[in-house]
Amino acid sequence: MGCSKGVRFDADVDIPDLSGKVIVVTGGNNGLGKETILQLAKHNPAKIFMGARSEEKAATAIREIKESVPDARITFLEMDLASFASVKKAAQSVLSSSSRLDILINNAGIMATPAATTEDGYEIQFGTNHMGHALLTKLLLPLLEQTANEPNSDVRIINLSSSAHTQAPKEGLLLSEVKSPMASTSTWALYGQSKLANVYFTRQLAKLYPRIKCVAVHPGSNVGTNISSSLKQSSKLLIPLIFISNRFFAIPV
């Protein structure tokens, strides 16, 4: 799976009316997540949960979105994907306050960070980008399935992956090592591993839950976000080269 030309998409025209829909977007206070919420809010959903760690930053993002969409119904959802306890609390908040869930967008992520582990002992990128989202999805699946069983439903799980999944270790997912910092493995390979896990997870979800449309989406290599904020400037210069190499050295998944 390599890079390919994208399909022309006009959010104002191509997103349908979302009246009555309930949506969860992780990492919604900045970058892709914030823009996603902005575009969805234009189409009248009943509620959008903005997953974020900081209530202050989320409040700022919500205020800025409402400058463009004054009637946007956006609710802050406190969530730290590096903490299973936080993810469970966030999921319970959704389940206790909403009778339906139409769209789950697992957008939040970190990239090429220094070696570390999550609160629960997983390699930080694998734990944040994959394990946190996998747990959130599992906990919300009963509500997603319930909604999918309703007439004329269109329930979706969108996982933000990346063509950088091709940078994963040549052995694939090193599952015997993910409960450690994996400091001897390059940070780029660890990022690729987390993105490869996103792709595998999405494929399995699609098999197990045919009533739910499950897709893994590569957002593009020239999208302006702060995901690379932890990188040194010299490392940031390598990002375009990594995506170029994906075109020529992609491995199938």
Language-model region placement:
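Rossmann-fold NAD(P)H-dependent dehydrogenase/reductase core
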Residues: 3-232
